[in-house]
């Protein structure tokens, strides 16, 4: 995967949150908190992200996405001919919805995983698609992008 995407994801995925508290005397105190998954929840999420070569946590289902970003991820995968992947509707389970955000240290849904490794959300997948990196990543998974066949036909 392109190192720019990895470093961007690493920078954005910090699970340490800084907060400020205002006291009655007007002073502000700063604190930090780290979000943690329970070990049972983390193990379950680890199993979920490794269920298939491509796993998507989204709002809705591939047949009926419930937000524009989830729909964009489905459409990008569909353009590449990736129709066989595990998907989880986070609207069905609040624990999964919050747990996956903590697990990946990524604040938004949808979330895409390749071979159990967090790739990113809609923005990262779109950048990978536009740059051609997604074709390469799919090849590493043993998935031939349908866009390669379209390129051959157009020549």
UniProtKB/Swiss-Prot annotation:
CDD domains in UniProt: GRX_PICOT_like (cd03028)
Superkingdom of the organism of origin: Eukaryota
Residues reported in the UniProt entry to bind glutathione: 59, 97-101, 109, 122-123
PROSITE patterns assigned to the protein according to its UniProt record, in alphabetical order: GLUTAREDOXIN_2
Principal location: mitochondrion
Described purpose of this protein according to its UniProt entry: Monothiol glutaredoxin involved in mitochondrial iron-sulfur (Fe/S) cluster transfer. Receives iron-sulfur clusters from scaffold protein ISCU and mediates their transfer to apoproteins, to the 4Fe/FS cluster biosynthesis machinery, or export from mitochondrion. Required for normal hemoglobin biosynthesis.
GO molecular function: 2 iron, 2 sulfur cluster binding; metal ion binding
Organism ancestry: Eukaryota, Metazoa, Chordata, Craniata, Vertebrata
Protein name: Glutaredoxin-related protein 5, mitochondrial
PANTHER family assigned: GLUTAREDOXIN FAMILY MEMBER, GLUTAREDOXIN-RELATED PROTEIN 5, MITOCHONDRIAL
Any single GO CC term annotated in Swiss-Prot or TrEMBL for this entry: mitochondrial matrix
Binding site for [2Fe-2S] cluster: 67
Presequence boundaries: 1-14
Quaternary state and interactors: Homodimer.
InterPro entries in the record: Glutaredoxin, GRX_PICOT-like, Monothiol_GRX-rel, Thioredoxin-like_sf
């Amino acid at each position: 995967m392109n190192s720019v995407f990895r470093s961007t994801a690493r920078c954005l995925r910090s699970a340490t949150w800084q907060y400020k508290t205002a006291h009655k005397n007007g002073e502000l105190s700063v604190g930090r908190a780290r979000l943690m998954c329970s070990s049972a929840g983390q193990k379950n999420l680890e199993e979920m992200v490794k269920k298939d070569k491509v796993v998507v946590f989204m709002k809705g289902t591939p047949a009926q996405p419930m937000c524009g970003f989830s729909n964009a991820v489905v459409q990008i995968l569909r353009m590449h001919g990736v129709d066989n992947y595990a998907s989880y509707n986070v609207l069905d389970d609040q624990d999964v919805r919050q747990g996956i955000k903590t697990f990946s240290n990524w604040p938004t849904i949808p979330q895409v995983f390749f071979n159990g490794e967090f790739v990113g959300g809609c923005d990262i997948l779109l950048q990978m698609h536009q740059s051609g990196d997604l074709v390469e990543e799919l090849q590493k998974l043993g998935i031939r992008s349908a866009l390669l066949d379209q390129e051959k036909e157009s020549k």
